[in-house]
Structures are given as C-alpha cells and as structure tokens.
Amino acid sequence: MIKKKSNSFLSCDRKTSVNVVIWCPDETEYDEPVAVLQICHGMIEYIDRYDGFARYMAERGFVVVGNDHLGHGKSVCTDDDLGFFKDKNPGEALAKDAHHLTVLIKKMYPGIPYYLAGHSMGSFVTRRYICDYGYELDGVIVMGTGHQPAPMVFAGKVLADVVRLIKGDRYRSRLISKIMFGAYNKRIKNVRTVNDWLTRDEAVVDEYNAGKLTTFLFTVNGYRGLMNMILYVRKPRNIERIPKNLPMLMISGLDDPVGEYGKGVYRAYNSYHGHIDDIDLRLYEDCRHELCNELNKEEIYEEIYGLSLIHI
C-alpha cells in the first residue's frame, strides 16, 4: 500500500511553513526505493493535484515528494499571501525552497537516484534550480514550459514594476492576468470555460474552476518573481552553469499555448541542446497544458517512468 505523508519546513522567507507531501512505495514490495522524484507544481495550483501521477510512480518503487510553493496551497500564513512569493528577490525564492527540500529528502533517502520534475511555472522553477543546484540531480523533467520572446517578458516585468510602484507589491492586477492568460483559449473550438486550455478533461477543468486554491488572482509580487525567473533561465551564462551530463526530458502538448503550440518548446530545447549532452524532446498531439491531467495521462506517466529507468 502506498503511504502518503505530510511534513513541513521553514521557507527561505523565514516566516512561512512550507507544506510538503511525500508518497512512499509499498515496503512489502520494495526493500528500498528505486529513486526519488521531486515535483515542482505550476502557478495557481498545489502539490496534491499530482496525486494520481505520484501514486503511479510510487507503485513502481519511487519515493515522490513535492511542496506547495510560497503563495500556493498550504504554504501561506493567511489567504492574503496567496499569489505572493517573498518581499525581496521573489524570483529566487521558489528554487531555494525546492533545493532545501532536496537536501532534507536526501538525508532521508541517501544514495539513490534523485530526479526533479517541474510543470508550467514549476518548469521555470526547475530550470532555475538546475542553473544553481544541478549537481544535486541525476535527471530533470521539464513539462509544459515555454521560451517567450525576451522583449515580451521584459515588457511584462516593466508593467509589473510600474503597477507595484503605484499600487504596491500585494496588489492583484486583473490587467496583468488578462495579458498573461487572455488569449490561451483562442485555438479551442466550442469553449466552455476560461480555463479550457488546461486540459481536454472537462472534469479536471471544472474541479479547477471550483477551487479556492486554483482561482485566486496572482499578486504583482508573484508576477515579478515569475518574470525574473523566466529572464534568468534564458541567459546563456546561467545555462552554462548547468552540468553538461545532467539528463533532461522536455515534454509538452502540441495544443499548449504556454509553449506556443510547440514553437516555444523547441526554442527552449534549442537553448539547452548545445550544452546538455543528453536531452530528449517529446511533443504530444492534441494535448493541452496539463499533461499529467490529460485524457491520455497514463501514456505520459509511462513515458516519464520508462525514460527515468534508463538513467537509473
């Protein structure tokens, strides 16, 4: 039987208790775990949304672990902190916390392969992590990422900085949200809801639309942190800091607007291709943004599991 446990640690902001969830394989089937898989979730969601994927991997011998990022899920002091990262240097906070979790889990499970997977905003957390702490890992999985043109990202950062000066760091801007997400449904026929771009699975979309922890507006601080991460991970000098021998799997849906329907994912792939020795790109027909919640999610799980085994 899979054991699911909760834990916590103090964030790098020195005040927030970061919520951690651990899925452990059945001890009667596995004397020791095959590997550890750490997950970085996306924007405006929480780690428990990966329960199905985590259980799939745990059933195959993996310890799966993840935390709610600052400003997400249970990693808040009050609801006012939802969508807020950290007063200073918000762009580095999520990767710092993710690395702290790695250190803690490695003490619990020493000497076995350690993988990091990140989805959407979590893919940018993961891409920042491997610039700063790539030496900790035996492999990395980048899901639902993008490579937006630098002028566009910089313009978004400037807008967030201006709004911050006028309204403050905790202001929740519908304008920025509309600019970020407003066009994501444009290729979908017969749109049902504002979040149809997430997945073809209508039940998942409806559950997402009904949740308090998946429908809040991001703060200006959160957007600033996200823009800073996106700009950070694309700089050649930061990419050069990634260990060349770190295997990377990059996966995305061809109907994912975050990855510009494959174009942005190819640009991200090409930015690493000349530096990382072992990098693999997989794009899935008809799939939207949340691959782990898609109609063919079992295929995605199987792909990740199979490619992980190659490097164990």
Residue ranges of predicted features:
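Short beta-strand/loop motif that positions the catalytic acidic residue
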Residues: 250-252
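Conserved small/polar residues in nucleotide/adenosyl-binding loops
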Residues: 310-312
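Alpha/beta-hydrolase active-site loop
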Residues: 86-106
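Active-site glycine-rich loops that stabilize anionic/oxyanionic intermediates
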Residues: 34, 41-45, 254
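Alpha/beta-hydrolase-fold enzymes
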Residues: 126-213
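N-terminal cap/lid segment of alpha/beta-hydrolase-fold proteins
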Residues: 1-27
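Conserved alpha/beta-hydrolase
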Residues: 54-80
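Post-His helix in hydrolase/transferase enzymes
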Residues: 263-264, 292-305
